[in-house]
Amino acid sequence: GPSMVRSAAKNHASVAIVTDPADYGELISAMDAKRGATGYDFRRRLAAKAYAATATYDAMISQWFAFADQQQAFPDTLALAGRKREELRYGENPHQSAALYIPSGPHARGIAQATQLQGKELSYNNYNDADAALELVSEFRDGPPTVVIVKHANPCGVATADTLLEAYQAALACDSVSAFGGIIAVNRPLDAETAEAMAGIFTEVVAAPDASDEAKAVFARKKNLRLLLTGELPDPAREGLSLKTIAGGYLVQSRDNGRVTQEMLKTVTRRAPTAQE
């Protein structure tokens, strides 16, 4: 169990502890080169991976006891565990480095779990904008066809209609200038007709639950456009924590899953708007 793994890692000066099958090939090569032995630097690297594996295991157990068992909103100790999925070209600015980590465990679902079918690698800003677009369009998960267009993490067009094409045309009409180079998210499987319309202007990313083969063929002509398939959209009412780093600490709050209803809207001007307004 974990105790044996930690014990072996602690003694990495003379023990090689392998917890990742991806290291089997390098281990065999190292042993072949050294007549059954391994180098210290290699063992130290294996030990680091072993400690990371046991730390992740312990963090997942800690999270279960803190949230699932005791129903604590904010536990005394917040144990975080994530696995690096990829290193990104740069961060929010070109001089910053960046990487994408995904939470350990089987239940995470969102833009980080989307499948990219085409296009160059996503940047830090692409992920940030696509996340904002997916979170917003998920508000309409069970609604009529809806299209969201986001630029710099802010919506510049949102519309619902009888068809996905009509919703896209209406969303684009909100601010066609800002939509150039933006991120699009939809709440329905993407069809070829809508894909053709989207391909008419430069778009960084399109995120959809699914896409028809014909829609994929349309986007295949746009080599720089990234098509992300998300599967079923996340539940906008799901609970969870939102975390933000500040200098010297973390700010943690519950997810913003509140919904605005018609009853909550009030007229605060002297004159009420007309139905057309």
Language-model region placement:
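ATP-dependent carboxylate/acyl-activation modules
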Residues: 57-59, 63-277
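Active-site loop-to-helix "anion-binding N-cap" substructures in soluble metabolic enzymes
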Residues: 2-69, 73, 120, 154, ...
